[in-house]
């Protein structure tokens, strides 16, 4: 009888240990799951130009200049293009547009159309850029040009947006934020001109999608 009693005690101890270790195991699993989620995001800094970046990153002036110049080239390739200066100004405001290089991603037929109407086509000035580490753990930096409208009637007014129209908040350089790694991926080249107000519509749609996604995520976390 004593031996049987001893066996029951051992069984009890195992059962007690299992019940009390389970929450710990779940917590460890949750930590690894969160770590996996974090790997899909990237911390980036927002700068207006290379000088802003250099001031915030002493000793990294060369990297800041390279990232800024690369962002300018990317802006030429991916920024919304307009057939006339007036269309661009209506979207982004006076003093916010420039002539785009003829080779900046546009299809030849659209270049010809723009040249017939005004001699060239137009694009917004790069208002700033995002800068983050290169994917894959590289030693270099990735960058993404940002645009902003000075026209109060535009959905992009006072905001940083990328070439696809995604909104990254107030157009205030010096901020640091977390973005999906896809945000730093190269955007497709612009191959057609945008109609007046077309980019603003894209920004409005993207903002609606972002709010909807944020609401869905909040509801999911809250059960």
From Swiss-Prot:
Residues 178-223 are annotated as: Disordered. Residues 204-223 have a biased composition (Polar residues). Pfam families: DUF1190. Residues 178-195 have a biased composition (Low complexity). It comes from the Bacteria. InterPro entries: Biofilm_formation_YgiB. Belongs to the UPF0441 family. This is UPF0441 protein YgiB. It comes from Salmonella paratyphi A (strain AKU_12601). The lineage of its organism: Bacteria, Pseudomonadati, Pseudomonadota, Gammaproteobacteria, Enterobacterales.
